[in-house]
From Swiss-Prot:
This is V-type proton ATPase subunit F. One of its GO terms (cellular component) is fungal-type vacuole membrane. GO terms for molecular function: proton-transporting ATPase activity, rotational mechanism. SUPFAM superfamilies: AtpF-like. Gene3D superfamilies: ATPase, V1 complex, subunit F. The keyword Metal-binding does not apply. It is found in: Vacuole membrane.
Amino acid sequence: MAASAVSYKERQFLAVIGDEDSVTGLLLAGIGHVTDGPDAQRNFLVVDSKTETSAIEKAFQNFTQERKDIAVLLINQHIAERIRHSVDSFADPFPAVLEIPSKDHPYDPEKDSVLKRVRRLFGE
């Protein structure tokens, strides 16, 4: 119990991997944060058609494995599809990974990794 309490107490930020409109909206809502120090890291990644899948994968790994201050990772569902293997295999309780729709790509519950796990749990 104490170990889990320590693991979530430091987690106080949201992170987002998304298209420009989604990230801009969330930044305007106040989730933007840049870490202190010479290696200042942002808690967001703007993805467009020119963004390489490896950059998305690197940001996902950074937000989920390396950074211990992220509590929730929001990722546009169509971007999560590009790194589906990583999203589906991530099973840690923190950060919570939530797939969200974008302006041009509606939400599809059949693709959501969290809903897939819930369905398997209940035998559907």
